[in-house]
Amino acid sequence: MATPPKRFCSSPSTSSEGTRIKKISIEGNIAAGKSTFVNILKQVCEDWEVVPEPVARWCNVQSTQDEFEELTTSQKSGGNVLQMMYEKPERWSFIFQSYACLSRIRAQLASLNGSLRDAEKPVLFFERSVYSDRYIFASNLYESDCMNETEWTIYQDWHDWMNSQFGQSLELDGIIYLRATPEKCLNRIYIRGRDEEQGIPLEYLEKLHYKHESWLLHRTLKTNFEYLQEVPILTLDVNLDFKDKEESLVEKVKEFLSTT
């Protein structure tokens, strides 16, 4: 029996063939269409995978694909932290943002050891990143007085430490910004009918839109991560229904990937 060839000993961000896994974050406002968009992308190419936001964990519900996954300690203890945050933001914003970032890091790190390890041209699409966790959502809650000075300081310290431990594995090769007006996002919130989000006011979406524009369109938002200033960004107008221009959007993504 012939001895099988030795396989390349790969790092978490490298496929078993030695090809680096491209990591692309899909960013945008609440209900801009990120979940719909990543579902489109994962059907395009077998070398493309997506890591959806772990919303089920935030709502303390096991999603279908996690049917056999062991519950985390936080899930066993109960509590819909997403709903708690929306209902009483001054009390729960710090808890929610910390857990949202933790669960995101856990999901994204786990994905690096998935089926893409055998892919020829692997691309991993994250539904949001640890950077929007901090510089869009947590920052907005602090500026809206939903986090006090002590909580914000602790959150930033914790975020810096988590990134010092795991951030290199999650560094982005590109960002796709799904750009939609706050009014369109509010309409989509009503349509998708997620109970926790039904009380979101337009003003909240407008604040998040402004931050996304500053970070991803005008590139004036400052972060602690210098490399982000040079990360390529593809901006897609998604005010229209994806069904009307799905093929065009996919082609733009392919072209973007060829240059990153």
Curated annotation (Swiss-Prot):
Give this protein's Gene Ontology molecular function annotations: ATP binding; cytidine kinase activity; deoxyadenosine kinase activity; deoxycytidine kinase activity; deoxyguanosine kinase activity; deoxyribonucleoside binding; magnesium ion binding; protein homodimerization activity
Which reaction is the catalytic activity of this chain? 2'-deoxycytidine + a ribonucleoside 5'-triphosphate = dCMP + a ribonucleoside 5'-diphosphate + H(+); 2'-deoxyadenosine + ATP = dAMP + ADP + H(+); 2'-deoxyguanosine + ATP = dGMP + ADP + H(+)
Keyword entries, A-Z: ATP-binding, Kinase, Nucleotide-binding, Nucleus, Phosphoprotein, Transferase
SUPFAM superfamilies reported for this sequence: P-loop containing nucleoside triphosphate hydrolases
| Chief place where the protein resides | nucleus
Q: In Gene Ontology terms, what is a biological process of this protein?
A: deoxycytidine metabolic process
> Which sites bind ATP?
28-36, 188-192, 240-242
A GO CC term attached to the entry: cytoplasm
Phosphoserine occurs at: 11, 15, 74
Biological role stated in the UniProt entry: Phosphorylates the deoxyribonucleosides deoxycytidine, deoxyguanosine and deoxyadenosine.
Similarity annotation: Belongs to the DCK/DGK family.
Protein name (Swiss-Prot/TrEMBL): Deoxycytidine kinase
Organism, scientific name: Rattus norvegicus (Rat)
Encoded by which gene? Dck
